[in-house]
Amino acid sequence: MTVSEIFQTMDYGTAPENAAEALAWIVDQGSRFGHFIDGSMTPLGEVFESRNPATGEVLAHLSQATQADVDAAVKAARTAQPKWEAAGGHARAKVLYALARLLQKHSRLFALLETLDNGKPIREARDIDVPLAQRHFY
């Protein structure tokens, strides 16, 4: 038996990463995403489509930021900064550590979303991109 024949008769199991989980999460969120500014999601304005580059399927509709959105985000950040600074290093570290742990807890979902949105191999998203994002907060 040749290698080619072996490959043609091999049975493959399902991959541990399944896009259905990420697609269901997107649908559960309403498939429409605004901006997170000043502690809450903003209403949608003009939107653009996020498409799976492998299939062309529309994954979600994302709000296109306007100058007013950017101004609101900067204003919220400036308002929050004194309180954040006054919290002290230990309190800020606890918040950032908690954020890193949430990224870690949901790493498979983030990897699937990244793969669907960018078309990159799941291995790259799972083993490089998501862990790198987590390390930014440790």
Where are these regions (language model features)?
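Terminal low-complexity tails and localization/encapsulation signals of metabolic enzymes
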Residues: 1-61, 94, 98, 131
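Glycine-rich loop-to-alpha-helix module at the N-terminal edge of alpha/beta enzyme cores
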Residues: 57-138
